[in-house]
């Protein structure tokens, strides 16, 4: 089964604008769909809300920066979060530990507990699976060239 072209277009838009302020109202205006319909369609196709998708991608992108010595405020703002508090809360909801603990995990700091280590490992695995699933969804869209039909009455 092919991916929904509208959802693929929305995913591409979100990915291209992931570090900027994104609102459901803005998306519904750009794609000319009712906000409620768009949210239902997105959830039905991907089994995740638009906001959860955006937050997951932002957290995934921020993980790369956590390997550096950049401060957490800079990382949160550069990945589209309004505040360090919202970034930390979202990070903990998705990854299971706060960004500082995850940074220790990335740097193989021995001060993290075994439970934190397991949580970080499992969360990273799940996040990678999610990102790969979305990438496959985007690549599985049926292009317009496949819809070419010839009307036999005009031959």
Which functions belong to the PLM regions below?
Residues 8-16, 21, 25, 44-82, ...:
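Terminal helix-turn-helix DNA-binding modules in bacterial transcription factors
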Residues 1-19, 25-41, 145, 150-152:
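An amphipathic alpha-helical interaction segment
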Residues 24, 30, 35-42, 66-103, ...:
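Sequence-specific DNA-binding recognition helix
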Residues 89-155:
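…primarily DNA-binding HTH/wHTH and HhH modules…
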Residues 17, 37, 41, 57, ...:
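Generic alpha-helical secondary structure signal
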């Amino acid at each position: 089964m092919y991916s929904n072209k509208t959802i693929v277009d929305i995913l591409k838009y979100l990915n291209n604008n992931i570090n900027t302020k994104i609102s459901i109202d803005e998306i519904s205006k750009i794609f000319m769909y009712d906000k409620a319909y768009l949210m239902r369609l997105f959830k039905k196709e991907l089994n995740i809300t638009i906001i959860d998708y955006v937050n997951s991608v932002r957290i995934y992108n921020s993980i790369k920066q956590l390997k550096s010595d950049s401060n957490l405020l800079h990382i949160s703002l550069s990945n589209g979060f309004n505040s360090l508090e919202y970034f930390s809360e979202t990070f903990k909801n998705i990854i299971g530990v706060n960004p500082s603990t995850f940074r220790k995990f990335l740097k193989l700091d021995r001060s993290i507990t075994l439970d934190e280590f397991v949580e970080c490992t499992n969360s990273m695995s799940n996040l990678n699976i999610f990102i790969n699933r979305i990438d496959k969804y985007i690549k599985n869209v049926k292009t317009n060239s496949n819809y070419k039909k010839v009307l036999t009455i005009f031959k």
